[in-house]
């Protein structure tokens, strides 16, 4: 006689997935070590997630966690209404927070969430002037990020304008919910054992990049669908992807999710 096993419902609630996401960002993404200070950069719309990240950072042993809030509407108001000739003025303290954290051996996590069409009607020269000014002042910090001198991480979260571009047939509320579902699925935050799954995934990426580095292929040849492209690879090239290490030995994953491995092509003259 057969029998039917009734299994418990393993579906996680939204709050459980969000806590998982924050835990992944801190434990797998940022790799916070005891005693580190942490800077969180977050849009005001993502306050719920940012607060969970703060708590997870303290749970991981952070000594001090600060948040730098961003507001798209405030930024838009400036680009629309500020006088001409004022866009080389910046709030240096916003960049100084990054530089200070890096110089203290700290970690920086940024929650990126913005409406891609936010500045669609704004004078592009105003935006370009502001961006050039900020980039110039951030250069010392950017150099540390690009060379993995500190552990850093980028994650994302839905905001209404962005979500509705992704799901145009849904209401604003439904679009945000659907974008959350997509983010949770892509980051494995919808799984109870999300951290363990990420550890296995990063191990797989490491095996793949080590294999490819050992092969030292001369070129990659892409064919199909009207494409016939050969890309030469640099001598003694190294494949990267997945987790990385700081000079101090802290392992971090700069982007969650991340699925690719990559390398450098040969420079042509």
What positions do the PLM features span?
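Active-site bordering "gate/hinge" segments
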Residues: 9-265
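Conserved small/polar residues in nucleotide/adenosyl-binding loops
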Residues: 269
